[in-house]
Amino acid sequence: MESLLLPVLLLLAILWTQAAALINLKYSVEEEQRAGTVIANVAKDAREAGFALDPRQASAFRVVSNSAPHLVDINPSSGLLVTKQKIDRDLLCRQSPKCIISLEVMSSSMEICVIKVEIKDLNDNAPSFPAAQIELEISEAASPGTRIPLDSAYDPDSGSFGVQTYELTPNELFGLEIKTRGDGSRFAELVVEKSLDRETQSHYSFRITALDGGDPPRLGTVGLSIKVTDSNDNNPVFSESTYAVSVPENSPPNTPVIRLNASDPDEGTNGQVVYSFYGYVNDRTRELFQIDPHSGLVTVTGALDYEEGHVYELDVQAKDLGPNSIPAHCKVTVSVLDTNDNPPVINLLSVNSELVEVSESAPPGYVIALVRVSDRDSGLNGRVQCRLLGNVPFRLQEYESFSTILVDGRLDREQHDQYNLTIQARDGGVPMLQSAKSFTVLITDENDNHPHFSKPYYQVIVQENNTPGAYLLSVSARDPDLGLNGSVSYQIVPSQVRDMPVFTYVSINPNSGDIYALRSFNHEQTKAFEFKVLAKDGGLPSLQSNATVRVIILDVNDNTPVITAPPLINGTAEVYIPRNSGIGYLVTVVKAEDYDEGENGRVTYDMTEGDRGFFEIDQVNGEVRTTRTFGESSKSSYELIVVAHDHGKTSLSASALVLIYLSPALDAQESMGSVNLSLIFIIALGSIAGILFVTMIFVAIKCKRDNKEIRTYNCSNCLTITCLLGCFIKGQNSKCLHCISVSPISEEQDKKTEEKVSLRGKRIAEYSYGHQKKSSKKKKISKNDIRLVPRDVEETDKMNVVSCSSLTSSLNYFDYHQQTLPLGCRRSESTFLNVENQNTRNTSANHIYHHSFNSQGPQQPDLIINGVPLPETENYSFDSNYVNSRAHLIKSSSTFKDLEGNSLKDSGHEESDQTDSEHDVQRSLYCDTAVNDVLNTSVTSMGSQMPDHDQNEGFHCREECRILGHSDRCWMPRNPMPIRSKSPEHVRNIIALSIEATAADVEAYDDCGPTKRTFATFGKDVSDHPAEERPTLKGKRTVDVTICSPKVNSVIREAGNGCEAISPVTSPLHLKSSLPTKPSVSYTIALAPPARDLEQYVNNVNNGPTRPSEAEPRGADSEKVMHEVSPILKEGRNKESPGVKRLKDIVL
């Protein structure tokens, strides 16, 4: 029993030191418990001690070692420690003071739990003696105090429950003395208290009782029979009462241990001593040792093993053969010496199962197995060292009582699916003993490898027109993993081929990787295409890789050449050539297209039938040329069968019939070579592109300059009829639009200018009028469409309007005039006939002259066109430096748009046809507007002194402008924006010129004759206007300087047959000062001091004869004037003189 407890205790001591790897649990249970008794809940206690138990594991515990596997065990799932059978401590541990069962349990989390179960002893056994009766023979000669050992009682219980004392039936002759052996057991000796006398009593009977330490104590009794014999005076005597010897373990049988010797001085049989084991010597000891009864030699009879038992006690007695012999006793203690006779023993326990398996994804440090090495030897003989042999990705981690095998590198099952490991253990004895154990570690598979294609790029060549379903190629991917991890399936990655899914072109077998064509390929449509094949395994998660497959479609000669030139009708082409064409004349060029490639698409030409003797064909370029000349006697037509064939293995061809006609009307032109139409086409496109580019640059520069000029010039000064006609006569360029004054003219030039004005002024009118009629297809406004409607508002000032048949044209051109004139320019005043509101007149002193017509009458008629009255506009002051936005002016002129339905939009074409001549109309409308202003309005020109500064500079220009150029500030207005009227009509920004006519004016108009009714006399009566009053014009809009040549007035006045119905065009600035009436003149002309021609004209007017009152100028009918001016304008338009061109440039 002690031999079993010592290794367990040693193991527990070693495990206790490994606090980081072990947890100790201690329990106790009483003996004699039935099987299935629950000792403890190890799972609960282990969890409380810090174990990380996985509840999902079916087996939470695994028993590593168990000192009593037949007695106790642990349930692997519940963790309950239970008894397997009834435990008898007396048999398990015998006399050991403590009886402990040790278990080592490993949890699923690789934590080790050491369990110690102490078996508690119960007083369940009573002391017993080896025999039922003890018989003794005591010589009567025994002296008092003689001690005779008695057989000891045996109690299997341990400790206090063992034999504690002996009792003898009370008497006077004998007594008992209790003694203790070295192992703690107690025995009794019979002591002779008094001398014996055999003759008195030769036999005694007593009872000896053995008692244990229980409560109540258990007892065992034995009978003692004492026979008093005759005396043998000398007893054998040992030299020593105790002997101690040692013997090596594994000593062979008959190995002497000790020789005992007891002396007896008696002679004969009384002195002959015999030896024997006496007392309590167990059976195991008797098996190991024996004593020679005659010699007293103790020898070895069994196999001594230090690990089984290393100390034995032998009780030996010696007695003589004489009667009444009293034996002598001694104790022999035999110690077994340990030798290195046990090699280390290696025990391997896998963590997961009986087989050592580990996943290839196990990280370094992962425990795969537990190794326990034991050596039954002691000391250095039992101290063992272990190591792992071989170059393997594992290592051995040693502890005091066990070792672990850990992963020490990267595992790859695909390279090594198993490893053969050898563990070697050796002790420290002399000689050294060692042992080895080999085992196999299986590497389990993980899905750690992607499928790998044999090559990343596959290419297959297939001819077009293949059969759908034809096999193309096979792709192969290998996955070194096992099972589902290594099973590879294939699929095509979705993509597009010519805007169609690739699945409509090819398919793949998911298991074998065979790729098939789903359609018949056409090389002319698709020469090659690519797609990707995806290979993925069946692992979780699945791994995949892809490869590119390129399908090249070879061309097959499946397309017949198609003749494209000359054009065929039902397979026949007709060609005309001159009859006098010579040899080598190019008749036609035969062209054929073949959609195949290479030799399959290379086309050559030939003539197979027909009049081949007259013509030849170039086999490469298809040129058909004459080989002889044709005379007058030649027939008029020839036939040729032209064949175009390709050069495929199976040649395909196309033929056409070419009819060649000889035509005498054509001029023979020998063709020296073929004309490269593509080159001509490219050259033409390049030329057109170059011309367009240059044109765009020119237009951009022109527009940029025009935009700058809009901000530069004072339009109110340059758009007078004087400036316009001056440019036309003198040949000034478009820079005149920047001018704000007229250069002085010499007297000689004055006369020439007057003649030119008289002629070219008429041409301007005809030119403008003629274009207006040419471009007008839509309905015009006639006099029948115009009627006068009485006004509801009474006005004190009325106006007389000069009649003009071209007023409708003026109204039609007003819209264009509004859009084309620069900002701030005056509109045609014939479109602004209205009554001036006296309350809105501005009497500023900045303006010198004021002209007005005074009319008498209760109501002012409104102008009605096509049944729709034109809106009225109130007059308001307008400063010359105030420039409205173009958009505002266009909006304000919307009332007069398209009065005659004429479109003023440019068609974008250069042709001057009836429908697309709007662009030309716009080029002439400016002149028409100016002429109509002259013909329809009689207003005296006025102006003021021009400031002294450069004509090309603005009011804000500085010295640096002449060097660095002008900025936006230079073109800003000089004066702030005036305050306008808040009337609704004012918002529309329509500026009206109100003209007041006096009674004298009415009479003057009437003097022209009752048949000459003008537009100004509609609704007027001659008697309402006194003839004595002089006309006074009140111009509501003018500018600082009004420039008007008097010669122009005289020329135009002559054209009006003496009835002055035309006035110089005034600039758009409100004239605010009144002019005194002068009976000697019809009109007062504004004087511009810098102009000498104006000065001379004023002098002529002041000093010339006064016309009689009956010859006062009346409003003239402009139809007659236009009739006379039109031929002049037509002549100027046809000649396109430089002056006309310059005038067009100015207008545009």
UniProtKB/Swiss-Prot annotation:
Residue numbers binding Ca(2+) 6: 232, 234, 264, 266, 270
UniProt topological domain (Extracellular) ranges: 22-678
Annotated protein name in UniProt: Protocadherin-19
Residues that bind Ca(2+) 4: 140, 199, 233
Positions annotated to bind Ca(2+) 7: 249, 305, 307, 341-342
Binding site for Ca(2+) 1: 31-32, 88, 90, 124
PANTHER family: CADHERIN-87A, PROTOCADHERIN-19
Binding residues annotated for Ca(2+) 12, in chain numbering: 447, 449, 479, 481, 485, 537
A Pfam short name: Cadherin
Binding site for Ca(2+) 5: 140, 199, 230-231, 233, 266
Membrane topology: Single-pass type I membrane protein
Function: Calcium-dependent cell-adhesion protein.
Gene for this chain: PCDH19
Record's disease association: Developmental and epileptic encephalopathy 9: A condition characterized by seizure with onset in infancy or early childhood, cognitive impairment, and delayed development of variable severity in some patients. Additional features include autistic signs and psychosis. The disorder is sex-limited, with the phenotype being restricted to females.
Organism: Homo sapiens (Human)
Binding site for Ca(2+) 15: 557, 559, 594, 596, 600, 646
UniProt domain Cadherin: residue ranges: 22-129, 130-238, 239-346, 350-453, 454-563, 569-672
